């Protein structure tokens, strides 16, 4: 085939190669395992909900990429002894802790709780933020590391001083 056939789970369903094969909230480990075992899937993308992590753990031992966009503003509190945003961050950090050493965690530099998860990642870190000059990202880039930000009508992927623009 020309490219990878992607399996994906999220709160709307399960998809294989852009075809929905299940509907409903499929952001838990059972749906993720079904994608991992699907014979037509070459690569997988999972929305990983905190409830599933608390009830059943992760559906995988290691991942190549983990993305944490935010922790939320408390709308997911009250399940499984999760009573503060910091408690919720501990749960979401589990995904970052399971990045393969050759993998990458993509973390929101503008959210201090998310940015701090970098210390738990066995792989590399890519930070993102709206502000290209965010201090966390600026320090990271100055060390020759990767960062992503929006610049007008483009997304910019940078590593150190090198930048690649992707028009929106």
Task: Annotate each PLM feature.
Residues 2, 38-39, 98, 120:
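Alpha-helix C-cap/termination motif
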Residues 2-17:
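Short beta-strand-centered segment that lines the nucleotide-binding/catalytic pocket of NTP-utilizing
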Residues 5-6, 43, 105, 125:
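Hydrophobic anchor at the start of a short beta-strand
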Residues 9, 46-47, 108, 128:
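Generic beta-strand/beta-sheet core signal
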Residues 13-14, 51, 133:
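Positions that flank functional sites
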Residues 14-21, 41-43, 72-81:
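Short, basic, glycine/proline-bearing loop/turn elements
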Residues 19-56:
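Conserved nucleotide-sensing/catalytic segment adjacent to the nucleotide-binding pocket
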Residues 55-168:
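Acidic, Mg2+-coordinating active-site environments of NTP-dependent enzymes
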């Amino acid at each position: 085939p020309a490219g990878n056939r992607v399996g994906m789970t999220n709160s709307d369903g399960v998809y294989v190669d852009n075809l929905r094969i299940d509907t409903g909230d499929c952001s838990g480990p059972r749906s993720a395992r079904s994608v991992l075992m699907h014979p037509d899937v070459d690569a997988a993308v999972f929305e990983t909900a905190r409830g599933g992590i608390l009830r059943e753990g992760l559906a995988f031992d290691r991942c190549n990429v983990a993305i944490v966009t935010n922790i939320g503003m408390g709308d997911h509190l009250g399940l499984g002894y999760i009573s503060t945003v910091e408690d919720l961050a501990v749960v979401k950090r589990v995904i970052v802790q399971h990045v393969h050493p050759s993998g990458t965690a993509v973390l929101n530099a503008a959210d201090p709780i998310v940015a701090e998860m970098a210390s738990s990642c066995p792989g590399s870190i890519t930070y993102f933020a709206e502000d290209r000059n965010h201090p966390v990202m600026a320090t990271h880039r100055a060390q020759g590391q990767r960062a992503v930000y929006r610049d007008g009508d483009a997304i910019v992927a940078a590593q150190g001083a090198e930048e690649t623009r992707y028009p929106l």
